Every structure is written in C-alpha cells, then in structure tokens.
Amino acid sequence: DFASWKIKKNKLKMQQNRNVKDIKLNRLDKKITITFDNNKIYHYPAEYLRVYSPSAEVRGHSNQPPKLIYGRKHIGIMNIELVGNYAIKISFDDMHDSGIYSWELLYDLGENFDKYWDMYLKRLKQENRSRNP
C-alpha cells in the first residue's frame, strides 16, 4: 500500500526558508520519504519517527529527560495529516498520534539521522532495552 501527497510549494514554509516539495508514505516499507525544496531527500523509518516523537509524552515536561521508547522495531504508520502549513501529524499503529512534526524538526531528523539513530541504540543498550517487542 503506497500513498503519496504532492504538496503545494507555496503552502509549506518552514524556518530557514525551506519548503517541502513532496511527502510519500510507504506503508509496506514502513517509512516516509520527504523531499525539501533544496532537493534534499530524507527517508524516515517509522520506528525512528516514533522514537523521536516531539510529543510531550515522549519529550517529557520541562526538565524531565525524554522517555525511552523501545520495542517498536516493527511499528507502522497508519496515517499522515497536514497541520496548518508547517507540519504533519503522524498516527502510528501503536495508537500514538500526539506528536506534531514541524518541517524544521523533520529536516533536522533527516540531516542528523546517523547521529540520532546511534544515540538511540546506545541508550537502548545502556538501559538494557531492545528494539524488538
């Protein structure tokens, strides 16, 4: 099952004057692909997006450390919704749907994928947790 959204360039502004040109959800591969107006293309596995959800439930409140999300190796994405002209809301198949992913956040997650993924794997190991359910 493959869904693709062509986004109107003038509607999706983000900081640094970036626009999102295209968002594709591939449910079979469990990933989202986003093309920005500078032609950078980033592939976001569902697990990665779930782990780095910007929701308060995951990020914590004020001075709390982010909650470690584990056991989501096989998580899927049920739906993507546009939020205004600056973000998307992702509904995951574990029923988490409270994170609003701004274009700025998504660009950062794409640019720093290797670094952030490595940090996540190290934290899993430190806390004796697994990606497997």
Where on the chain are the PLM-derived regions?
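Motif-centric detector for short Cys/His coordination patterns
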Residues: 2-133
